[in-house]
């Protein structure tokens, strides 16, 4: 083997070892499309971590998990995950009929042991949607059953998250267009771009809090479960540097049903 081939082999081997050593982030949602909450953060971190997603339900409200609705929702979730570089996993709870029972918690605990995530990102625990509250309660119990101690971050959902304390604001301006692409993969839920419009309003509000003197920024809000021990870094410390804002966005109040971002 000549020196050129030897160097090339060594480089490939090193790259493979680095890829294998990458830590994991697990996002937990109640339904296919709840990824729209932390999409920006996931996109910002996907080059440093392996991102996985677990949905407790398959999105077929009060229908069976093998219904056409469930198949459509799962297909859209897979398409969204492909755009975001995420590996999806699906639970078997019924949409609108989800329960945080022992079997449910043990199934997720098994996945947690396999993935050993550095961080778990989930719904805030007080939420207008009962499936969201169930998913967070079951996840916290599953983490205990798995014997793990990952960082836990809660993400914000439009109007559904109730009284969530905001500990972190993450600037997602650089990946906003990519977030829109991911949201639009949920075709049956994003009717008339309603989810895009809602996330745009949320993002502009949080962006104005993060950068009061700089119009045009978009941000996501997060709450943490508990302070990390001294010397242990949050995944938020791996966020890439922000790019300069080229041109402030012109924001117009949307009319009912109006698409405000294209």
Please annotate each region the language model reported.
Residues 1-9:
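Sec-dependent signal peptide recognition
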Residues 11-19:
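Hydrophobic h-region of N-terminal signal peptides that target proteins for export
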Residues 19-115, 141-148, 238-241, 255-261:
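Active-site rim/loop-helix segments in enzyme catalytic domains that contact anionic ligands
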Residues 34-35, 60-63, 96, 126-132, ...:
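Active-site environment of divalent metal-dependent phosphoester hydrolases
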Residues 78, 140, 180-184:
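Non-transmembrane alpha-helical segments in soluble domains
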Residues 109-126, 135:
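Proline-aspartate-enriched helix->loop->beta-strand connector
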Residues 130-143:
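Short Gly/Thr/Asp-enriched flexible loops that form oxyanion-binding sites at enzyme active sites
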Residues 149-151, 155-262:
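The feature marks non-catalytic terminal segments
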